[in-house]
Amino acid sequence: GVYASKIEHYIPDKDKKFWEKLYKIVKRLDGLQFPIKRGSREIDKHFGYFGFRYHPIKHKSNYFHIGIDIPNRTGTLVYPIASGIFEYSGFNETNGKYVLLSHPEIKTEDGFVLYSLYMHLSKFTVKFNRRQKFLREISFHTYPLLPIEATRALGRVGKTGNIHGTISHVHIQMEFRKKDVIVAVDPLLFFGMKTKENKSIEIETPLAFS
């Protein structure tokens, strides 16, 4: 079914040694790639890094951003971070048009599997047909399994969903999942890129930002 934006995420900040080791292992994997191939690879310095920020839509301070935002031109192709299994594509008011993949070959020793989520797309280019969607529902999302190669575009950068007043970008979210437990992780560390603190972290009111 639909990816629920209300799912609770657990942030891996209690056992830094474990997560640092995991990041190092994953970024050495073959086939891991940045989702944008053309245009800027820069992250929105005010609101787009993984971590605490001021939420530009909800107008809340000290809000934890569980992904990264990559500004780019509307229509720029978005690719998967690695080959995986297509789980869902759809639309909701928060995510806009989005695509969800699982990566069963990337998992922890205790069974947490990596998932990647691509949000605010202007369009998605992968979806289930009616028969496939029916089979997914009656099989509790276990059949059919549709492989997605890393070379296949998932969609295009856009402004759909709850991003009013912000520029076109794609939001990338990476999570390790096991049953009902979902742990959000910093996508930048998977690509060996430097993560930073959002510049909006100290904003307390909308008037404090210019």
For each of these PLM feature ranges, what is it?
Residues K37-D44, P56-S61, E105-D110, N129-L145, ...:
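Intrinsically disordered, low-complexity coil segments
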Residues G75, K123-V126, N162:
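Disulfide-stabilized cysteine-rich extracellular repeat microdomains
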Residues P80-Y143, I167-H171:
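Zn2+-dependent peptidoglycan hydrolase active-site motif and core
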Residues F47-Y49, D110-G111, S116-L121, V183-G192:
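Short amphipathic beta-strand/extended segments with alternating polar/hydrophobic composition
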